[in-house]
Amino acid sequence: MLLGRDMTFSRKILSRGIAIKSTKLKPSKLPGVSFASMRTLLGKLPPLLCALLATGAAAQVSALRATSSNHLNGSKSSYLQRASQQPIDWYPWGEEAFRKAKELDRPILLDLGAEWCPYCAQMDRESYERPEMAKFINDHFVSIKVDFDMQPEIAARLQRAQAYMNLPAGLPLTAFLSPSGKLYFGGGYFPAEPRGGKPSLGEMLEGALCLFREQRKTIESGGFDVWTQEGV
Protein backbone atom coordinates (compact mmCIF):
# COMPACT_ATOMS: atom_id res chain seq x y z
CA MET A 1 0.00 0.00 0.00
CA LEU A 2 1.02 3.60 -0.47
CA LEU A 3 1.36 5.50 2.80
CA GLY A 4 2.66 9.02 3.39
CA ARG A 5 4.83 8.48 6.45
CA ASP A 6 8.50 8.16 7.45
CA MET A 7 9.75 4.62 7.63
CA THR A 8 12.88 2.61 8.28
CA PHE A 9 13.42 -0.10 5.70
CA SER A 10 15.42 -3.28 6.11
CA ARG A 11 14.43 -6.44 4.27
CA LYS A 12 16.23 -9.65 3.32
CA ILE A 13 15.59 -11.09 -0.10
CA LEU A 14 14.56 -14.74 0.09
CA SER A 15 17.24 -17.24 1.01
CA ARG A 16 20.12 -15.21 -0.42
CA GLY A 17 20.19 -13.06 2.72
CA ILE A 18 20.75 -9.91 0.68
CA ALA A 19 19.45 -6.82 2.44
CA ILE A 20 19.30 -3.08 2.10
CA LYS A 21 20.65 -1.48 5.25
CA SER A 22 18.18 0.52 7.32
CA THR A 23 17.73 3.92 5.73
CA LYS A 24 15.55 6.82 6.83
CA LEU A 25 13.31 7.67 3.91
CA LYS A 26 11.21 10.71 3.13
CA PRO A 27 7.46 10.14 2.95
CA SER A 28 5.68 9.64 -0.34
CA LYS A 29 3.34 12.40 -1.48
CA LEU A 30 0.98 10.02 -3.24
CA PRO A 31 -2.40 9.20 -1.67
CA GLY A 32 -2.87 5.99 0.28
CA VAL A 33 -3.94 3.03 -1.85
CA SER A 34 -4.38 -0.29 -0.07
CA PHE A 35 -5.26 -3.64 -1.60
CA ALA A 36 -8.72 -3.28 -0.03
CA SER A 37 -9.30 0.14 -1.58
CA MET A 38 -7.88 -1.18 -4.84
CA ARG A 39 -10.57 -3.87 -4.88
CA THR A 40 -13.22 -1.19 -4.29
CA LEU A 41 -11.76 0.82 -7.15
CA LEU A 42 -11.71 -2.20 -9.43
CA GLY A 43 -15.36 -2.89 -8.67
CA LYS A 44 -16.26 0.40 -10.31
CA LEU A 45 -14.26 -0.27 -13.48
CA PRO A 46 -15.36 -1.96 -16.69
CA PRO A 47 -14.08 -5.55 -16.73
CA LEU A 48 -10.99 -4.85 -18.82
CA LEU A 49 -9.88 -8.45 -18.80
CA CYS A 50 -13.24 -10.10 -19.54
CA ALA A 51 -12.60 -10.51 -23.24
CA LEU A 52 -9.10 -11.81 -22.55
CA LEU A 53 -10.26 -14.39 -20.02
CA ALA A 54 -12.99 -15.68 -22.31
CA THR A 55 -12.61 -18.86 -24.31
CA GLY A 56 -10.31 -18.86 -27.30
CA ALA A 57 -7.04 -18.40 -25.43
CA ALA A 58 -5.63 -21.49 -27.09
CA ALA A 59 -6.21 -19.94 -30.50
CA GLN A 60 -4.09 -16.96 -29.45
CA VAL A 61 -1.09 -19.04 -28.42
CA SER A 62 0.33 -19.72 -31.86
CA ALA A 63 -0.18 -16.14 -33.04
CA LEU A 64 1.50 -14.67 -29.97
CA ARG A 65 4.33 -17.18 -29.99
CA ALA A 66 4.93 -16.49 -33.66
CA THR A 67 5.48 -12.81 -32.92
CA SER A 68 7.12 -13.19 -29.50
CA SER A 69 10.61 -12.16 -30.53
CA ASN A 70 10.92 -9.41 -27.95
CA HIS A 71 13.72 -7.01 -27.12
CA LEU A 72 15.49 -9.41 -24.73
CA ASN A 73 16.73 -11.61 -27.55
CA GLY A 74 20.51 -11.59 -27.55
CA SER A 75 20.82 -10.54 -23.90
CA LYS A 76 23.93 -11.71 -22.02
CA SER A 77 21.70 -12.64 -19.09
CA SER A 78 20.43 -16.22 -19.27
CA TYR A 79 17.46 -15.14 -17.12
CA LEU A 80 16.47 -12.46 -19.63
CA GLN A 81 17.33 -14.72 -22.54
CA ARG A 82 14.73 -17.24 -21.37
CA ALA A 83 12.17 -14.45 -21.08
CA SER A 84 12.83 -13.56 -24.71
CA GLN A 85 10.65 -16.54 -25.59
CA GLN A 86 7.68 -15.19 -23.63
CA PRO A 87 4.80 -13.55 -25.55
CA ILE A 88 5.22 -10.28 -23.63
CA ASP A 89 7.11 -7.58 -25.52
CA TRP A 90 9.78 -7.20 -22.84
CA TYR A 91 12.44 -4.50 -23.05
CA PRO A 92 15.68 -4.49 -21.08
CA TRP A 93 16.26 -1.57 -18.72
CA GLY A 94 17.33 1.45 -20.75
CA GLU A 95 16.39 4.60 -22.61
CA GLU A 96 14.63 2.74 -25.42
CA ALA A 97 11.89 1.43 -23.12
CA PHE A 98 11.24 4.81 -21.49
CA ARG A 99 11.25 6.51 -24.88
CA LYS A 100 8.68 3.99 -26.13
CA ALA A 101 6.47 4.58 -23.08
CA LYS A 102 6.53 8.33 -23.69
CA GLU A 103 5.80 7.84 -27.38
CA LEU A 104 2.78 5.62 -26.65
CA ASP A 105 1.85 7.50 -23.44
CA ARG A 106 1.55 4.24 -21.52
CA PRO A 107 2.53 3.20 -18.00
CA ILE A 108 5.48 0.88 -17.54
CA LEU A 109 5.23 -2.60 -16.04
CA LEU A 110 8.61 -3.50 -14.56
CA ASP A 111 9.53 -6.98 -13.35
CA LEU A 112 12.70 -7.56 -11.31
CA GLY A 113 13.68 -11.19 -10.86
CA ALA A 114 16.50 -13.73 -10.75
CA GLU A 115 17.26 -17.26 -11.91
CA TRP A 116 17.44 -18.59 -8.35
CA CYS A 117 14.09 -17.06 -7.29
CA PRO A 118 11.33 -19.75 -7.26
CA TYR A 119 8.48 -17.24 -7.12
CA CYS A 120 9.91 -15.40 -10.13
CA ALA A 121 9.73 -18.63 -12.13
CA GLN A 122 6.24 -19.29 -10.79
CA MET A 123 5.01 -15.83 -11.80
CA ASP A 124 6.51 -16.27 -15.25
CA ARG A 125 4.82 -19.62 -15.64
CA GLU A 126 1.45 -18.62 -14.15
CA SER A 127 1.05 -15.19 -15.75
CA TYR A 128 3.71 -13.92 -18.11
CA GLU A 129 3.58 -17.00 -20.33
CA ARG A 130 -0.22 -16.88 -20.63
CA PRO A 131 -1.18 -15.51 -24.05
CA GLU A 132 -4.32 -13.72 -22.87
CA MET A 133 -2.38 -11.94 -20.10
CA ALA A 134 0.43 -11.09 -22.49
CA LYS A 135 -2.02 -9.56 -24.96
CA PHE A 136 -3.50 -7.29 -22.30
CA ILE A 137 -0.05 -6.22 -21.11
CA ASN A 138 1.20 -5.60 -24.65
CA ASP A 139 -1.89 -3.54 -25.45
CA HIS A 140 -1.72 -1.28 -22.40
CA PHE A 141 1.84 -1.20 -21.01
CA VAL A 142 5.46 -0.96 -22.00
CA SER A 143 7.19 -3.82 -20.17
CA ILE A 144 10.71 -3.96 -18.72
CA LYS A 145 12.41 -7.02 -17.24
CA VAL A 146 15.52 -6.69 -15.05
CA ASP A 147 17.94 -9.40 -13.88
CA PHE A 148 18.76 -8.88 -10.18
CA ASP A 149 22.21 -10.49 -10.45
CA MET A 150 23.29 -8.87 -13.70
CA GLN A 151 22.13 -5.35 -12.79
CA PRO A 152 22.57 -4.95 -9.01
CA GLU A 153 22.68 -1.15 -9.15
CA ILE A 154 19.34 -0.99 -10.95
CA ALA A 155 17.93 -3.59 -8.54
CA ALA A 156 19.00 -1.51 -5.54
CA ARG A 157 17.48 1.59 -7.11
CA LEU A 158 14.16 -0.18 -7.65
CA GLN A 159 14.14 -1.56 -4.11
CA ARG A 160 14.83 1.88 -2.69
CA ALA A 161 11.95 3.29 -4.74
CA GLN A 162 9.60 0.57 -3.47
CA ALA A 163 10.69 1.29 0.10
CA TYR A 164 10.10 5.01 -0.43
CA MET A 165 6.55 4.19 -1.48
CA ASN A 166 6.16 1.75 1.45
CA LEU A 167 5.78 -1.19 -0.94
CA PRO A 168 7.25 -4.72 -0.65
CA ALA A 169 10.76 -4.84 -2.11
CA GLY A 170 11.69 -8.52 -2.31
CA LEU A 171 11.78 -10.78 -5.35
CA PRO A 172 10.01 -10.86 -7.63
CA LEU A 173 9.50 -7.12 -7.57
CA THR A 174 6.56 -5.82 -9.59
CA ALA A 175 6.54 -2.07 -10.18
CA PHE A 176 4.38 0.31 -12.16
CA LEU A 177 6.02 3.51 -13.42
CA SER A 178 4.91 6.54 -15.37
CA PRO A 179 6.62 7.10 -18.74
CA SER A 180 8.90 9.64 -17.02
CA GLY A 181 10.00 7.03 -14.48
CA LYS A 182 7.85 7.85 -11.43
CA LEU A 183 7.00 4.74 -9.45
CA TYR A 184 3.39 4.90 -8.31
CA PHE A 185 2.29 1.36 -7.43
CA GLY A 186 3.63 -2.15 -7.11
CA GLY A 187 4.45 -5.08 -4.89
CA GLY A 188 6.08 -8.48 -5.09
CA TYR A 189 4.66 -11.78 -6.28
CA PHE A 190 1.06 -11.71 -7.53
CA PRO A 191 -0.75 -14.97 -8.32
CA ALA A 192 -2.66 -15.59 -11.52
CA GLU A 193 -5.89 -15.71 -9.49
CA PRO A 194 -6.75 -13.95 -6.18
CA ARG A 195 -5.53 -16.10 -3.30
CA GLY A 196 -5.35 -15.68 0.46
CA GLY A 197 -6.46 -12.06 0.36
CA LYS A 198 -3.78 -11.22 -2.20
CA PRO A 199 -4.97 -9.65 -5.48
CA SER A 200 -4.19 -11.30 -8.78
CA LEU A 201 -1.78 -9.84 -11.30
CA GLY A 202 -4.77 -9.10 -13.53
CA GLU A 203 -6.35 -6.99 -10.79
CA MET A 204 -3.08 -5.16 -10.22
CA LEU A 205 -2.78 -4.41 -13.93
CA GLU A 206 -6.32 -3.02 -14.05
CA GLY A 207 -5.73 -0.96 -10.91
CA ALA A 208 -2.38 0.39 -12.11
CA LEU A 209 -3.92 1.38 -15.44
CA CYS A 210 -6.81 3.14 -13.71
CA LEU A 211 -4.49 5.02 -11.33
CA PHE A 212 -2.34 6.11 -14.27
CA ARG A 213 -5.36 7.51 -16.08
CA GLU A 214 -7.16 9.03 -13.10
CA GLN A 215 -4.26 10.37 -11.01
CA ARG A 216 -1.66 11.26 -13.63
CA LYS A 217 -0.91 14.75 -12.27
CA THR A 218 -0.48 13.46 -8.73
CA ILE A 219 1.80 10.67 -9.91
CA GLU A 220 4.04 13.02 -11.88
CA SER A 221 4.24 15.65 -9.12
CA GLY A 222 5.24 13.27 -6.33
CA GLY A 223 6.88 9.96 -5.65
CA PHE A 224 10.27 8.50 -6.47
CA ASP A 225 11.78 8.96 -9.91
CA VAL A 226 13.36 5.60 -10.66
CA TRP A 227 15.10 6.90 -13.77
CA THR A 228 16.90 9.81 -12.06
CA GLN A 229 16.96 8.23 -8.55
CA GLU A 230 15.30 11.27 -7.04
CA GLY A 231 12.66 11.28 -4.32
CA VAL A 232 10.41 14.33 -4.31
Please state what every model-predicted region is.
Residues R5, S10-R11, S15-R16, S22, ...:
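Low-acidity, Ser/Thr- and Arg-rich intrinsically disordered low-complexity segments
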Residues K26-P27, P46, Q60:
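Short Gly/Ser/Thr- and charged-rich N-terminal loops/segments
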Residues K44-A57:
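Bacterial N-terminal signal peptides
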Residues A58-V232:
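Replace the tail clause
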